[in-house]
Amino acid sequence: MKTKLFVILSIALVTAILMFAGEDNKIPKGWFAAGSNPSEYEMGIDSTTFQNGQFSVYLKSKNPKSNEFGTLMQSISAENYLGKRIMLSGYIKSENIEGWGAIWMRIDGEDENQLGFDNMYNRAVKGTNDWKKYEIVLDVPSNSKSINYGILLGGFGKIWADNLNLKLVDESVPVTNLMRNNKLPAEPNNLDFEE
C-alpha cells in the first residue's frame, strides 16, 4: 500500500515539475520573473505582436483585480559601467492597462542599497497604446555592484516590450533618476504646525 502511494505521489510530483518546466520555457533566455507576486502574471515570448524582428516579450495579468506587480528582469554586474551614465531604452505597447506599465532600471550598491532608480512611475504607460519608445537614464556611481532592469506591469492589463537596449551616454543626456528628483529639504520647516 505504501509503495503504491509512493508511486502515485512520485508520478504527481514529476507531472507537476514537467508542467512548471513548460511554463519556464515561456521566459526568454537570460531573463527571470520577479515582482510582488509574479504568479499573478502570464509572461513570455510573443511571435505575433512585435515592434521589429520576429518576437517581443509580454506580461499579462491573470487577475482583473490585482494590486500586485510582475516583472521580467535581468541583473548584471556594474563593473564595466562604474562612474558612467547609462541609458535603457525600449519600445512598449499596451492593452487595457488599468494600473501601470513601464521599463525600469535600478542601480544597487553593497547590501542591495539603491543608488539609482527609475520605474517610470511619474510617466507610466496606461490604457491601450501602440508601440512607443521610452528611455531611462541613470548614473552608475563608483560604489555600484549591480544593474537591474526589465519590463513591469502593475495591476490589470497587458504590456509588450521589444528592442531593449542598454548603452553608455554622455553627461549631456539628463538623468531620469526618481531618487534624485525627490530631494529632501535642506532645513526643517513648520515644526510648530502654524504654517
Describe the predicted segments one by one.
Residues 19-195:
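Extracellular and organelle-lumenal recognition/adhesion modules and their flexible linkers in secreted
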